[in-house]
Amino acid sequence: MGQSVSRDDFIWTLTEQPHMSRREEIVKKYPEVKKLFGVDPSLKYVVSSLVIFQIFMCWLLQDADWILIILEAYFCGGIINHAMTLAIHDISHNTAFGNKYPLKNRFFGMWANLPIAVPISVSFKKYHVEHHRYLGEDGLDTDVPTTFEAEFFTTAPRKLLWLALQPFFYGFRPLIIYKKAPTDMEILNAIIQISFDLLILHFFGVKSLFYLLFGTIISMGLHPSAGHFISEHYAFKEDQETFSYYGLWNLCTFNVGYHVEHHDFPYIPGRDLPKLRAMAPEYYENLLKHTSMMQILTEFVVNPAMGPYARLKRKPRVAQEFYGNYQLFEYVEGFLHHIGVYRLQKFAVNVFDLNNNSKKLN
């Protein structure tokens, strides 16, 4: 169990990620795949039901014993909260309202964020774009572990600890690898989330808030739901960059297990990814796949070939960008233009200048 990992570096590759070329081939061979693009009409209702259910659980557990709260957080709330993080993942691809309504998708992501107790929705979207566009590229894809993680978590006990601490590495790694300016939407996301947490604390007490927060943390660490963090891109086979999981846990994770399919077509909603696989099976059947979340986690811990270094990595194609997109400001500015505020401002300036000129003449 104390055996150290056999890798001492990432798996550096000069090849481009395979997803774009496979996407082009599939679209050319099966043009009907485009019918799967777009909105998941059920997503709004499923997400809203889970948010309301978690608020109900907060009411139900406000006077419960701490042991019951911990058990409920692991077996119930944790599964739901992790599902909400993956709903946010789906929403980040605008599958709730479509690409024509990005602001609606961002606000709906904040709604899905509420039971998680930590503001992640907008920040996740900001970094997830790079994960798809620059998969595995050094300094751009923050899904790849830092050198410290890879150098320190090298034995089975340490890898187990790394899995337990995954929510903290996942949350703070972007601040180390790729610093970006906070955007207006991120600040709004934080304000809304903190306000919700304070309301839970005020009306239901500390036990209910703990139920939400502990459920989020534990479900992203030593929990079957967290198996997808490892299954998606860790190199169980060195010449394959992305892996899919086909098992029952997809029912609790918005089909995030269909990860090869997702990277091939990010704008197909999670619920329709099995249709993509059925439509073009020859592109996916020969790839290594996973069928058990517990097996994924166990093999990662005990197999010396696996560890944080077991990731394909590339040299970056572009430089980092510090400044973010101030999306809300753009919409506010557009709204002010629409209702004529700027025309009124221009008129007032002209009147003011006219008055000043008249006074000078007098």
Curated annotation (Swiss-Prot):
Catalyzed chemical reaction(s): an N-acyl-15-methylhexadecasphinganine + 2 Fe(II)-[cytochrome b5] + O2 + 2 H(+) = an N-acyl-4-hydroxy-15-methylhexadecasphinganine + 2 Fe(III)-[cytochrome b5] + H2O; an N-acyl-15-methylhexadecasphinganine + 2 Fe(II)-[cytochrome b5] + O2 + 2 H(+) = an N-acyl-15-methylhexadecasphing-4-enine + 2 Fe(III)-[cytochrome b5] + 2 H2O; a dihydroceramide + 2 Fe(II)-[cytochrome b5] + O2 + 2 H(+) = a phytoceramide + 2 Fe(III)-[cytochrome b5] + H2O; an N-acylsphinganine + 2 Fe(II)-[cytochrome b5] + O2 + 2 H(+) = an N-acylsphing-4-enine + 2 Fe(III)-[cytochrome b5] + 2 H2O
Transmembrane regions listed in the UniProt entry: 45-61, 71-91, 107-127, 160-177, 198-218
Motif, Histidine box-3: chain positions: 259-263
UniProt entry keywords in alphabetical sequence: Lipid metabolism, Membrane, Oxidoreductase, Sphingolipid metabolism, Transmembrane, Transmembrane helix
A GO biological-process term: ceramide biosynthetic process
GO molecular function: sphingolipid C4-monooxygenase activity; sphingolipid delta-4 desaturase activity
EC number: 1.14.18.5, 1.14.19.17
One Pfam family matching this protein: Lipid_DES
This protein's GO CC annotations: membrane
Record localization: Membrane
Pathway info: Lipid metabolism; sphingolipid metabolism
Locus of motif Histidine box-2: 128-132
InterPro entries registered for this protein in UniProt: DES1/DES2, FA_desaturase_dom, Sphingolipid_d4-desaturase_N
Family of the protein in this entry: Belongs to the fatty acid desaturase type 1 family. DEGS subfamily.
UniProt-recorded name of the protein: Putative sphingolipid delta(4)-desaturase/C4-monooxygenase
Species of provenance: Caenorhabditis elegans
Gene that specifies this protein: ttm-5
